[in-house]
Amino acid sequence: QPTKVVLNDTVWNIHPSHIAIDSGRVFIDNFLFEHEDQYLRIDGKLTKKESDSCRVDLRNIKLDYVLDIVQFDDVEFGGLVTGKVHLKSVMKNPVMRTRLNVHKFCLNRSLLGEADIAGVWDKELGGVRLDAQIAEKGISSTHVTGYVSPKLKGLDLSIRADSTNLGFLQPFIEGIFSEINGRVNGNVRLYGDFKHLDLEGEVRAKMDAKIDVLNTYFQIRDDSIHISSGSLDFRNVKVYDREGHDGLVNGYLHHTKLKNLMYHFNIRGNNLLMYNTYEAGNMPFYGKVYGTGNVVLDGGNNAMTVDASLTTGNNTSFTYIT
């Protein structure tokens, strides 16, 4: 009989179908789960025989529905999945091949583009080996290879980025940087269990971001960032403020599996806009400070120290409220 199911405040229809279970075999005749232009259709046989197969058709299924099943929630994926999954010999030696398209594929709410994903089941891993091409037409391309394993509760992905949107980093560095905008080129490995992910690689970035405690925006026009397990290292990275004044940044951002951030940055500026705040109730001072010299930021565990040795430049204003 037709059945209605509510999933995330959306009413889905389960159409009449026939499912039979007999001696460890499952026979599915046209199971259809749909809502408007979204559907999941399953048809075929789940048995030990290599000659028996099952096909799963998807159209506009939200990617986060799928990943909720494996409790992969430290990284947020988005997009609409359309494609086919072919299964054989599921009850003995599973064989799976899939070809999926993800429309408006997002990572941490940052658009990466249209994703074309090919996958095969790996029995040893208990997961899927995948090869994905992700592209924003005329803007960027990202190539991802590796595996995702529910059995191991982890993943290991090699990512080759060509002008890839790096806004996906924002959740990992909340409270230090905000309003991240830019593109990245290079190679990165994302690996670890779903709850304890890590990164390594080397990239060149073109980006701008705000350092929250200083309320200043800095731009990297094209420079390298070194990524190793637990650390992002900045070595003589040239930065610019929004008025074109320049400086150099040295330092690091340390993390424990993308959590518990600790950082140390030395910003050496040449008439660089180092501080730009307005009168507010939580601080006894405010102002706009152009400086030549050094500002050192140290922080972590919800604490921060700022140490400055500067010669102030023209157009500097600073007010201490008594």
Please state what every model-predicted region is.
Residues 1-187, 194-322:
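Interface amphipathic segments
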